[in-house]
C-alpha cells in the first residue's frame, strides 16, 4: 500500500493523490499468477460484501493482433489503442470517427471495427478471435485466456462474473500479456485493475523477471462502503472497560482475563483507567464507536 500521484481533474472517486493497494507475484511466468491474483482480489471484495461486479479481461497481444490483422502498422498501435480506450464513452461510431480523423485508411478502420461488432464477451468471443486472427495471434494466448476465465469461474468464492472485453486497453504500455479491470455499476467505472508486465523489472535490474500484479483504488472502495453505510464486522460490539485506578493487581488480572475472553469471541475491548470526569471520558469513547461500557471498582469482585 502507498500513496500515488497523477495529473488529473479531481472528481468523484478520482483524485490527484490516492492510496493504492497492490498485490504482485514475481518470478511466476505462467497464468497461475493471474488466476491467483484475481481470486485473491475478488475474495477480498466479497468479504467487504461487494456483489455482482465484473472482472473484465483481455490480453495486450490480442490488441496487437487485432490491429495487425486489420492493417495498422506497429508504429500506430499506441494511437489506435488510445482511441479504442474511449469506446465506453464515445461508442463504436466515435472510435471510427477519431481513427479516420487520424488519417488511417478506411478499409483498415472498417475491418478493425467489424471485429468488435462480431466478438462476444465470453469464451466464445476468445475462440472467435483465435479463429479469425489466425497467424496474427499465437495460439497459446487465446488458450491461456480461456483457462484463466474457466479457472476463476470454477473456483471463485465471491459473487461476480468474468467477461472477455477486447476493448480493454489499460493505458500502460508496459503490459505484456493478460490485463484486467474491476467494474462496478455502483461506481460507474473501474475500481481496480492490473496485468502482466514481464519486461519492466528487467529494464531496471538487468535480470529478466516475469511479473504480474493487481491493485484496487483504496479511496474508491472506501467511498462506496461509506455510501452504503457499511459496518465493520463486530464494530457494534465495541466495549470499554473503565477501571478504578485503585484496583488491586489480583482483581485487575480477572478483568484482563474477561477482556481476553471477550476479544476471543470477536468483541473489540478497550481497557482504560477511570478518569475524574467520567462523563467526558465516555463521551470521547462514544465518538470512537464504543457503545457499551463496564465499570470496575475495587469491590466489583468478591473474595
What is the meaning of each model-derived region?
Residues 40-46, 61-69:
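Hydrophobic mid-domain F-helix/FG-region of cytochrome P450s
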Residues 17-21, 57-65:
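Short, conserved phosphate-binding/catalytic loop or strand-edge motifs used
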Residues 71-73, 288-289:
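Short, hinge-like loop/turn segments at secondary-structure boundaries
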Residues 1-50, 99-303:
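Positively charged, Gly/Ser-enriched RNA/tRNA-binding surfaces
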Residues 55-58, 86-92, 140:
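Short acidic alpha-helix initiation/capping motifs at coil-to-helix transition points
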Residues 72-95:
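Acidic, His- and aromatic-enriched active-site or binding-groove loops in soluble protein domains
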